[in-house]
Amino acid sequence: VSLGLAIPAALVSRVPVQDPDAVRRGEYLFQASGGCACHGEPGNPQFSLAGGRPIKTPFGIIYGTNITPDKETGIGSWSDRNFLEAMREGMSPEGEPYYPVFPYTSFAEMTDGDVLDLKAYLFSLPPARKENKEPEFRFPYNTRASVSAWRMLHFDPKRYAPDSSKSEEWNRGAYLARAVAHCGECHTPRTFMGAPDQERYYAGSADGPEGELAPNITPHEKTGIGGWSSVDITWFLQTNLLPDGDSAQGLMAEVIDKGYKHLSESDLKAIAVYLKSLPPIENEVKKK
């Protein structure tokens, strides 16, 4: 009897106890990030965050990584510092730079508290043992030296700084859209070096994730969402229903279903207020 009791106790002792409030906050941030859809394996719920999803880019294919708390194949051995450095600085625990397909360029704007709450949530989930797959990039993009050079030119790891001239609602929407939901990562066209074109932020991209079109979400009347009201934007993020009754497909449908639809109406409205305030940019996104 004593042996039967000792074994579970030993197992439990190796599982870190997470603060339930941090887990709850982290789950909300996880949803605000779109449910980390890129880290799942399509059609396999058992590995919903264990990586393996191929993400096509103009430079080759990269695979979503295992972000479950498995200690050997996931992030289960990561310290708080490791997690912060990955999310905010794009560096692995081994000191290697991550490819910027991982949107640390946006997550860098998150607060330390929010990043660690997200970690608490991920570490509360069941671990899944699944090895990560190496990227399939062509030369020279398959070298870490090229990543380091890219970072020197295009990465500025600064936190979000509230704009005192704007409302609290606007700042909340800006923080969610820019940092947590990382909308600009998909909806901003890229330069030939794969960096976001800062002069056309949110203006849409023909080279979206998995070869999909990422529409213009600036308030341009003809090529963007200038004809949408804040209510239209909020409703879309809740239901995936466009103002004309159609719906988004592909990855956007996934991030709404796994993430955005679970957010509070006030947060979705804040995102809408922020998007409506952006400079309208004319850019009709078409297939190449």
Per-region residue spans from a language model:
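N-terminal type II signal-anchor transmembrane helix
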Residues: 1-9
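Electrostatic cytochrome c docking/interface patches
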Residues: 9-31, 149-178
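Sequence context of c-type cytochrome heme-c attachment sites
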Residues: 10-12, 23-27, 47-73, 101-105, ...
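The canonical Cys-X-X-Cys-His
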Residues: 26, 33-42, 83, 118, ...
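Detector for the c-type heme attachment site
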Residues: 38-44, 88-89, 123-124, 186-192, ...
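Electron-transfer interface patches adjacent to heme c in soluble/periplasmic c-type cytochromes
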Residues: 54-85, 105-113, 200-243, 256-268
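Membrane-embedded segments
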Residues: 81, 90, 95-106, 111-121
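Extended, well-folded interaction surfaces typified by the phenylalanyl-tRNA synthetase beta subunit core
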Residues: 130-145, 287
